[in-house]
Amino acid sequence: MASIQYLNATHTLYSCLKHSTPSSHDYSTCFLQQDSLTCSIFVLLCTVAYCFVWSILCNNVSKVDQIWSIIPFVYSWVFFLHYYFLNNEIHYRLLLVTLLITLWGVRLTYNFARRGGYGNFIQHEEDYRWPILRKMMNLPTWLLFNLTFIAGYQNLLLWLIALPANIVSQGGAGWDELGFLDIVLGHIFFFLIVLETVADQQHYDFQEYKYSLTPAERLKSSQKSVREGFFQDKYWKYCRHPNYLAEQSVWLAVYLFSCISTGELWNWSVVGIVLLVLLFQGSMQFSESITLSKYPLYAQYQATVPKLIPRCCCCCDASSNKKEKSE
């Protein structure tokens, strides 16, 4: 039945687009004739094609990185606008979720842009991990990896993490549906955005300062992080990836909005946050292997500082006391 539904949806979309000059009415009719999930799938397929084709034309697979902070809130706005135009009313919980995801996207887009991630659109920086992986594969294997994982799976994941917003759209829409839990979760979401922003800024300031010094000046620096080459102060002395901790928690909060809407702790959209956590685990492991190859003292940092979850103060104190006694 699902396959028939999507075949019908594809036929309707083709009917809307086959005219040389379709009107805005044609587009809106096509949009509302499909359910919001189907509309989002069309966006997903377009982004996969865009990322794969442009990665070949530009010899740069970081097109997914460029839309990473943008496409999730596009999906959320698709869900919100579809509900609004179909029902002629505002879904307030969905609007709240959409605005929060948009806030996340604007912040992350700015952070990516200031690091030169967008360049001049055609020529832009490629994530340092991709060239390393590219050297490990022959061309056919790399192209297959590009299509299935970089352009395919990562875009699928961006779609999946936004799907709790679709679950929210199926729940109560009225202003009176917003309750205490929505307010608490909204504040937690905002706190996580601030946490991630501060952590990113700390690391950005460190990198800017480090690369403003000559290699000789770095070795003579009074700052341990500068001498050893990697940041290990402020938030980064509590865990090795505080920004990633906040990032994953942000999407857990998005999922919890769907739980509030359904009144149940579990729904099928949980697959997005689960797969996101798994992706981050692999990404962190690969990134740290590169860092370790450049900075041997990073192994000591790994041994003493947790990867994601900071140790509580009492655990840290107990560990320090134990270390002092052993010495």
What are these regions (language model features)?
Residues 2-48, 71-112, 155-202, 207, ...:
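Hydrophobic transmembrane alpha-helices
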Residues 45, 52-60, 66:
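N-terminal, membrane-interfacial amphipathic/helix-forming hydrophobic leader that caps
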Residues 48-54, 142, 167:
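Intramembrane alpha-helical segments
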Residues 53-54, 133, 291, 301:
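Broad structural signal for hydrophobic residues in well-ordered alpha-helices, predominantly aliphatic
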Residues 55, 121-124, 144, 194, ...:
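Residue-level signal for the start and early helices of compact helical domains
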Residues 57-58, 137, 295, 305:
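A broad structural signal for alpha-helix termini and local helix breaks/kinks
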Residues 60-74, 116, 120-148, 229-236:
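Juxtamembrane helix-capping/reentrant segments at transmembrane boundaries
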Residues 144-154, 159-160:
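Voltage-sensing domain
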